[in-house]
From Swiss-Prot:
This is Eukaryotic translation initiation factor 3 subunit H. One of its GO terms (cellular component) is eukaryotic 48S preinitiation complex. GO terms for biological process: formation of cytoplasmic translation initiation complex. Belongs to the eIF-3 subunit H family. Keywords: Coiled coil, Cytoplasm, Initiation factor, Protein biosynthesis. Residues 273-303 form a coiled coil. Residues 11-160 form the MPN domain. InterPro entries: eIF3h (IPR027524), eIF3h_C (IPR045810), JAMM/MPN+_dom (IPR000555), JAMM_MPN+_peptidase_M67A (IPR050242), MPN (IPR037518). GO terms for molecular function: metallopeptidase activity; translation initiation factor activity. Gene3D superfamilies: Cytidine Deaminase, domain 2.
Length: 365
C-alpha cells in the first residue's frame, strides 16, 4: 500500500472490470446499477482489478414512497445488508488469492444525471467509514451508446467532507469556508489497462473481409502499400462519422432546462426566507424599541424594569434552508452544459461535411 500522505493521481481500471460495469449497467438500465470495486493503491495510482455488483433489494409492492426501487438501488452501497455482503465477498476473494482491498464503488448514470444526494452520501460513507482513499466510478450508459466510453472517477474534496460532516450549509458557513459548487468533487483521470498478451491478441485479430470483389495487385509494391493489407481490427472506421444528434442533444437540453427551473425554485425559496426573516426582524426591532420606552418610563417612576430579552420567547426567527440542494443542482447544470458543449463541438465538423446535402440549392465546393 502506498503512503497516505501521497495524493491519488489517477485511477487505472482493468478492461475486464470495465466490461463487467458496462454489462451490469446495461442490463439494469434505466434503473441505477451499483457495485463494489477492489484493487490496490500503488504509488498514488488506484488500480481497480475486480468488481462485483450489489444484490438488488426487494421493495414491497405496497410501498408508499415514490420511486422507491430507484432510491433503494441508488442507496445500495451504504445499506447495512450490502455492507455485510461486501465483507463476505472480499473475504472469499482473499481466499482465492485475488486483490481484496476495497477501493470504492461504481454506479450507472443516464445523460450525466448523477450529481445528487445519493452519490454524495454513498461516497461520504466510503471515505469516512471504509477507506479514505476510495473513488466512485460513474458509467454513463446513454453517453457510451453514442460510440465513446464514458467512465469517470470522482472523490469528495476534503473541504466538502468537513462541511458535510457538520451538516451546516448555511450562507454564513459557506462564506466562512469559501466552499463553492466546483469544490464538491475532485475528478481523477481514468486509464484503461490491458495485459500485454491481450493487447497482442487484439492486434492479431483478422480484419473483416471486404463486401465487394477486389482486383488483384499488379506488383508486390502495390500489395505492400494497400491500406487494406495493413488495416487491423483497431483501425478507426466510418461509424464515428454517424450524425446521431437529435436523441442525445435534445434530451440533454430538456434536462438542462429542468435543472434551471429547479434552480429558480430554490432561489425563490431562499428569497421567501429572506423576506420572512426581514419581517420578523422588523417586528423584533419594534418590540425592543417599545420595551425600552416602557423601561425608561418605569425608571422615572422608580418601578422594576422589564426584561428586554423576552423577545426570544415571543418571536421565532425562520430557519434558513440548507444550501446543499442548490449547490448540487448548480453542479448538475454545469455538468449538462459541459456535455452539450462537448457533443456540439464533436458534431460541428460532421455538420460542415454534409452541409451541401442539408441546405437545398447549394453545391459542394
Amino acid at each position: 500500500m502506498a503512503e497516505k500522505e501521497q495524493p491519488l493521481k489517477a485511477v487505472q481500471v482493468e478492461a475486464l472490470v470495465v466490461m463487467k460495469i458496462i454489462k451490469h449497467s446495461t442490463q439494469l438500465f434505466p434503473t441505477t446499477a451499483t457495485g463494489s470495486l477492489v484493487g490496490m493503491d500503488v504509488r498514488g495510482t488506484l488500480e481497480v482489478t475486480n468488481a462485483f455488483p450489489f444484490p438488488i433489494v426487494d421493495i414491497p409492492a405496497d410501498s408508499h414512497l415514490d420511486g422507491a426501487p430507484a432510491n433503494a438501488a441508488a442507496a445500495a452501497p451504504r445499506a447495512k445488508s450490502n455492507a455485510v455482503y461486501q465483507s463476505e465477498m472480499i473475504k472469499m476473494l482473499r481466499e482465492v488469492n485475488i486483490d481484496a482491498n476495497n477501493v470504492g464503488w461504481y454506479t450507472s448514470a443516464n445523460m450525466g444525471n448523477f450529481v445528487n444526494l445519493n452519490i454524495i452520501e454513498n461516497q461520504y460513507f466510503y471515505q469516512k467509514e471504509l477507506n479514505e482513499r476510495t473513488v466512485a466510478l460513474v458509467h454513463d450508459v446513454s453517453r457510451s451508446s453514442q460510440g465513446a466510453l464514458s467512465l469517470r472517477a470522482f472523490r469528495l474534496s476534503p473541504q466538502f467532507m468537513a462541511a458535510f460532516k457538520e451538516n451546516k450549509f448555511t450562507t454564513e458557513n459557506l462564506q466562512k469556508s469559501n466552499l463553492r459548487y466546483q469544490d464538491i468533487f475532485v475528478e481523477l483521470p481514468v486509464q484503461i489497462h490491458n495485459s500485454h498478451l491481450l493487447t497482442s491478441y487484439l492486434h492479431q485479430l483478422p480484419s473483416p473481409p471486404p463486401a465487394e470483389n477486389l482486383d488483384l495487385p499488379p506488383s508486390l509494391a502495390a500489395l505492400t502499400n494497400d491500406p487494406l493489407a495493413s488495416s487491423s481490427l483497431l483501425t478507426p472506421n466510418f461509424d464515428n462519422l454517424a450524425l446521431s444528434i437529435d436523441p442525445f442533444l435534445e434530451k440533454n437540453c430538456d434536462m438542462l432546462l429542468e435543472s434551471i427551473e429547479t434552480h429558480h425554485t430554490e432561489n425563490n425559496n431562499f428569497q421567501y426566507y429572506q423576506r420572512s426573516l426581514a419581517r420578523e426582524q422588523t417586528k423584533i426591532a419594534a418590540w425592543q424599541a417599545k420595551r425600552k420606552a416602557e423601561n425608561a418610563t418605569r425608571a422615572q417612576l422608580k418601578q422594576p424594569l422589564l426584561a428586554e430579552d423576552e423577545w426570544q420567547r415571543l418571536f421565532k426567527l425562520p430557519q434558513e434552508p440548507s444550501r446543499l440542494e442548490s449547490m448540487l443542482n448548480t453542479r448538475q447544470v454545469e455538468q449538462y452544459s459541459r456535455q452539450i458543449d462537448g457533443f456540439v463541438s464533436a458534431t460541428t465538423g460532421k455538420m460542415f461535411a454534409v452541409r451541401g446535402n442539408l441546405l437545398p440549392g447549394e453545391t459542394q465546393v
